[in-house]
């Protein structure tokens, strides 16, 4: 088998989808996006993964990638919009598409695939501070351990297409304010809080039986920031 044949068979597929609203308090609300990765590339430790990230984390990633690859012109992110509206379907879809295009371009740049922060961003649940610390070797766990500990059931569009095709028109009868109307659900704050509570309970039980408490705590904590981005 020649190198050309091998390169044709290697692939890295990424999807940015399923925007969900997270309400931190009365004033602070943001949207997170699900990032699904499917690959057979030897560059990645896990061949399938799903994590959730917010816009500000994409900004951090681009900044770190640029610092480590000064001679490369990185793809641009969708611009920050001071008038971004959480209830505006067009704003959400436009940003989501821009984030996916950014990741697709990054993953097509071989030099960037060696950056450990990119792998932590795509395949771990660590916060920005924890990703930075882990990449610099300042944690008790390695990059590989952080990635392997990431749970998250992967859900890919190509695998769900059959289910989508089998749905009846009753889907349209179920539309409500919890849906963007574009196939990307906007999760109410109450459901998000339930998910977070579930994660906290899981982390507590895991810590009680696993000595790697620091890593588990990092994986179970979701990043928090300011305002609506």
Swiss-Prot record:
Residues the entry annotates as binding a 1,2-diacyl-sn-glycero-3-phospho-(1D-myo-inositol-3-phosphate): 54, 95
A Pfam family per the record: PX
Domain-level remarks: The PX domain mediates interaction with membranes enriched in phosphatidylinositol 3-phosphate.
A GO cellular component annotation in the UniProt record: centrosome
Main location: cytoplasm
Entry's localization field: Cytoplasm; Endosome membrane; Cytoplasm, Cytoskeleton, Microtubule organizing center, Centrosome
GO molecular function terms attached to this record: phosphatidylinositol phosphate binding
Gene3D superfamilies the record matches: Phox-like domain
GO biological process, one term: left/right axis specification
Keywords, ordered alphabetically: Cilium biogenesis/degradation, Cytoplasm, Cytoskeleton, Endosome, Lipid-binding, Membrane, Protein transport, Transport
Entry similarity comment: Belongs to the sorting nexin family.
InterPro entries for the chain: PX_dom, PX_dom_sf, SNX10/11
Gene coding for it: snx10a
Domain PX: 11-128
Lipid bilayer topology: Peripheral membrane protein
Record keyword Cytoplasm present: yes
Protein name: Sorting nexin-10A
